[in-house]
């Protein structure tokens, strides 16, 4: 994913604020996770998430993600 549109970024920020679930596709794998925070790592943005069943922390760099969908 090259960049998020303003609408997609607003949806992502809202999901983080509410602690909503996200469906993230990266390298052919689908992840359903709970959004926790948006972070900057140098010039790259990443999404800090947790797995809803195990509680394992997962980090996703936005520039490595194929698609992001907010589950309302």
Language-model region placement:
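Basic/aromatic-rich interaction segments and small domains that mediate binding to polyanionic partners
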Residues: 39-57
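Mixed-charge, Lys/Arg-rich low-complexity intrinsically disordered regions
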Residues: 1-15
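Short coil-to-beta-strand transition motifs
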Residues: 25-32, 58-61
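Short beta-strand-centered aromatic/proline hotspots
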Residues: 31-40
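A short, Trp-centered hydrophobic/proline-enriched beta-strand micro-motif
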Residues: 18-26
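Residues that act as N-cap/strand-start positions at coil-to-secondary-structure junctions
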Residues: 16-18, 32, 54
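Structured surface patches comprising rigid loops and adjacent beta-strands/short helices at the edges
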Residues: 60-71
